[in-house]
Amino acid sequence: MRIPICLLAIILAGSGMATAQVSPFVEYGATVHTGDNIPLWQVSNQQGLGSIYDNTYIRGGLGYKHRLGKWKFEEKLDMVAAVGMNFKGDKDIFIQQAYIDARYKWLGIFAGSREKGAPLLNNALSSGDMTWSGNARPIPQIMIGIPEYLYVLPRFAIKGEISYGWFTDNKYQERKVGAGHWYTKDIKYHHKEGFVRVGVPNGKWQLDIGMTLDTQFGG
């Protein structure tokens, strides 16, 4: 235990720099039920940290934001130790989030797995859209694009991104489906989206229109 504490102390000591911000965190959660399964809304929108079985978990990690010249960087590592998350009574340790996000002016470059919700929706109230929700663990991917609205005209802004990634559920499918049944391994992931915004910046009324595409391929 001494080594992690010492390392954390060193990182926190360096967070006093004007351009750096360190954010350590720890979280504990548990869900129990008396019926056949956990109620739907106690499982939904949990970014994969929910289960129809009784479950408990502890998670912790470290976020780091800093600047390097005109570049802005954000890194994060988030790990989870859980019981009953995938199968009844099973024990698992996994990485929930691990990513680096780099921004230069309007350009964004991202690599890793990060929790995200559906665009244009209030993810605290919604169960997701037709292609994306907050019900599964993040998908590792590499992305490039314009992550925030960029005004190209006084009342017209654009944003968009494209990414490629891969699913990490091979072992889950092997245990869930079992031998003698068909299932696909090593599936790849592709995402792209584009949006336009019409309206006065920071005005009371703005119109957002766009399209998203999420696909599976390979395997």
Where are these regions (language model features)?
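Signature for the C-terminal beta-barrel architecture of outer-membrane proteins
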Residues: 147-219
